[in-house]
């Protein structure tokens, strides 16, 4: 008996030493041989933004598969749907009267082009109306004009700037005036009889030559760039400074004119993909640890923090694990999802198309929301998540975990990022939520989401965290519990909330 006990203790000691050595090697590789800056340059500077349906999205998928193959990691493209193919080329906007000035802005995603020589026209702003009849009467006068469809912002300074320098009375007055103006604008829009989605079509059908918008993101020099709703005329987003200048000129009767030359290509129907790569497990190859990050982006910037940084974390984690942990117990699979921005489509397609993998998944680690170090992990509503996630976190270096707050069992995410696709299917999927770094105002879906906003020290920290979590989840002797929490009562309805339901992806988009 003593002999057997000695053998068992020796095995535990050797196994523990082996784990410690592997973890040390993982941390050293992630720290001293980081490839993050180079990967970021190739993805963000050279390939650029990754709007679904664009050639750049396909180029990014091909780049990722080749990169994985160069590291000795088998990879493939998972075709899950089709999308409207489109390519942004260029936008040139100039004020030509009452003076000459180049304006700053761009066409929205999937916007139609102008003709080769562009279009020059006067501008009009949305009128104050009492009802739909008045608005329809106004529409008769927009033929041959650009229509400025968004509210003129009362200030181009973000609230934090006001709070720092304004008197309290001035700050409060500005906020009240802005709130009153916003409420009046929305009420007026309702009186037109159209919504934010349908009013573009009404303006286009009335003969306008283009729509000018300005979706300010409440920060210096930042606008959010989404998609056009027009079919034949361009939709152009102007930065706040130029938009409000033109708006004032219209109000004061200065009759400004602008010239717009916007170029883009319609590419028909194109396939959409996920990039999948895996390090095959040696003991339990049919059980999976999944690393998750959406690959697509909006295209106002280059998609650096949404979600270039999440992509980089998962790619670098796979590189490090392949180098220092090439024979994992369980298969470690990475998914770079397409079309997250249009509704988690890529990850929902994966969950739907690979039910066996989903059924045998140990854990999913997802990273999406920005460049900052991870500061929050919650248990996603899984009752026993505390037991295994906390155990895994204990092996992460303290200088990484000291920033992290955990909450268990947490609550299941119904949307927001790709972890929700797995949670809905009952898989323990954890979002590695990061520090803000002014994400929502300055980089989330904006024209300023670019390489220079990345905090590489924080991203390196996230690689270490993700690599250690993946290693520990792979090595764990036990399979994770999927027992769910009892859902709480909704305070508004008085009814018990339900677990999020699995949804099918949109497999034909923009058509």
Region annotations inferred by a language model:
Residues 13-15:
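N-terminal signal peptide c-region/cleavage motif recognized by signal peptidases
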Residues 234-238, 248, 319, 439-511:
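His/Asp/Glu-rich mid-to-C-terminal helical/loop segments that flank catalytic regions of hydrolases
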Residues 20-54, 80, 90, 218-228, ...:
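N-terminal capping segment at the start of a domain
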